[in-house]
């Protein structure tokens, strides 16, 4: 085999598209945690992870159907000093956690709502992790 050929340029895996905000960091971290099998979705899994103190942080929907669910998750987070992020809609959490189908254009379709989620393994998203840890530090 000869080396007759031009140089092959490889595109970087993730191109930085400017500074990442809290929402973008949350989306990236939840997707990375989903791929690394470090995401607990739903009330039952969330409460188990919070009780075992395995959670790095928790995400809770503000439009949760049951006020007792909200109270339970907030209390567990406060008791175990686990950071809590509130999101406006449970469909947003469902989309970020991968509970949806994507069409040809890459838009989320048939999104299933998710009231709460917990990250137990960060995955390989370093930029989002740094932004969220800075956010948690500034919040306290």
Curated annotation (Swiss-Prot):
Protein keywords: Nucleus, Ribonucleoprotein, Ribosomal protein
One GO MF term attached to the UniProt entry: structural constituent of ribosome
Primary location group: nucleus
Domain of life the protein comes from: Eukaryota
Function: Part of the small subunit (SSU) processome, first precursor of the small eukaryotic ribosomal subunit. During the assembly of the SSU processome in the nucleolus, many ribosome biogenesis factors, an RNA chaperone and ribosomal proteins associate with the nascent pre-rRNA and work in concert to generate RNA folding, modifications, rearrangements and cleavage as well as targeted degradation of pre-ribosomal RNA by the RNA exosome. Subunit of the 40S ribosomal complex. Involved in cold-warm shock-induced translocation of the RNA exosome components from the nucleolus to nucleoplasm.
Subunit composition and interactions: Part of the small subunit (SSU) processome, composed of more than 70 proteins and the RNA chaperone small nucleolar RNA (snoRNA) U3. Subunit of the 40S ribosomal complex.
Protein name, per record: Small ribosomal subunit protein eS12
Phylogenetic lineage: Eukaryota, Metazoa, Ecdysozoa, Nematoda, Chromadorea
């Amino acid at each position: 085999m000869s080396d007759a050929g031009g140089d092959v340029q490889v595109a970087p895996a993730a191109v930085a598209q400017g500074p990442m905000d809290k929402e973008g960091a949350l989306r990236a971290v939840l997707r990375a945690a989903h791929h690394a099998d470090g995401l607990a979705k739903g009330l039952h899994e969330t409460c188990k992870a919070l009780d075992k103190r395995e959670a790095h942080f928790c995400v809770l929907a503000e439009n949760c159907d049951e006020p007792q669910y909200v109270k339970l998750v907030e209390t567990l987070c406060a008791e175990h000093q686990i950071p809590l992020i509130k999101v406006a809609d449970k469909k947003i959490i469902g989309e970020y956690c991968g509970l949806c189908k994507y069409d040809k254009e890459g838009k989320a379709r048939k999104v299933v709502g998710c009231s709460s989620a917990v990250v137990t393994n960060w995955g390989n998203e370093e930029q989002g992790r740094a932004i969220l840890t800075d956010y948690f530090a500034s919040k306290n």
